[in-house]
């Protein structure tokens, strides 16, 4: 199923490699974000004051245990968000990689994938009616962060068969005065279109972050192509793995003999490099797929103005 939860599970599977964490189950709904008493089946063996557990993407800190299955808790522990939970929801005890941290890493990777250096994006459109007396158009409802770059500007033609000729001369100005351009964006057209007809702007937009609390949301809401659904878990696993070697270097506890002999320093870094190589290859493939779908058209140049715009200007 293509949901955020599936991404979380894929990330955790890569990091744990078959290791099974201790689980329990809620025996009563958590219907309020201020509720500080939680009941579980009690099948987990480690319930005690100081234990941390998670339900969905919320972390809880146990402040007391009564009867083996009634827990007094702090809510929203560790920077997670307190929310409601249903009866029979799964409880993960002392998770090595909390869900909320995995979701944060997934969003960090979606942002990274949207970098021009990585070449992934979602294509979106907006439109407005052309007015011959107006040169600059406000891109209402958008923000500068939502537009990486504009791909094309076309307008509705008239005739027996409607076409959409391309406007090749335009420029996008950011950080405009919001009293004139409420979005802070001004699209300046240097060539005309048909008055009263729709102008359509296609633009490359960053991938959309996933919800930190609704793990049932579909992955398609990010704007990522289905063929690239394997990328965010790879990036998230890499990000979470980078902090793993730090713990073994703490000076307040002696490392186990297994750490010293079976998992020598550098072993974790080798696993990280394997993930990085796999992600790099997949990223190149998906970026190439987008280039093929939306090829660069060198005749399109927002910096070029028609000759009429330069008339009357001196050479010096």
Language-model-detected regions and their locations in the chain:
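Short glycine-/aliphatic-rich beta-strand segments at the starts of folded cytosolic domains
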Residues: 36-39
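Acidic glycine-/aspartate-rich tracts in secreted/extracellular proteins
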Residues: 43-44, 64-69, 75-81
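Glycine-enriched, solvent-exposed interface loops adjoining structured elements
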Residues: 1-32, 45-60, 69-70, 83-316
